[in-house]
Curated annotation (Swiss-Prot):
Binds to the 23S rRNA. Keywords: Metal-binding, Ribonucleoprotein, Ribosomal protein, RNA-binding, rRNA-binding, Zinc, Zinc-finger. GO terms for molecular function: rRNA binding; structural constituent of ribosome; zinc ion binding. Its cofactor is Zn(2+). This is Large ribosomal subunit protein eL24. Binds 1 zinc ion per subunit. One of its GO terms (biological process) is translation. The keyword Transmembrane does not apply. Belongs to the eukaryotic ribosomal protein eL24 family. NCBIfam families: PRK14891.1-1 (NF034186).
Amino acid sequence: MPRWNVCSYCGREFEPGTGKMFVRNDGRVLFFCSSKCEKYYFMGRNPRKLKWTKAFQEARLQRAKRRK
């Protein structure tokens, strides 16, 4: 059974054979599920500030727990 990839920007799982794989000069491998994620990553956008990313949703839950 093939292993699903996880987007390095938004955290979404996607099928093998789709998306893009980017290898940095230091050897770190980044997977992107869409061109939107790839462009946002290279523009330097913070995924914790975008509502549609998993990082935002996790940070939101942590903020809610601290308030209680």
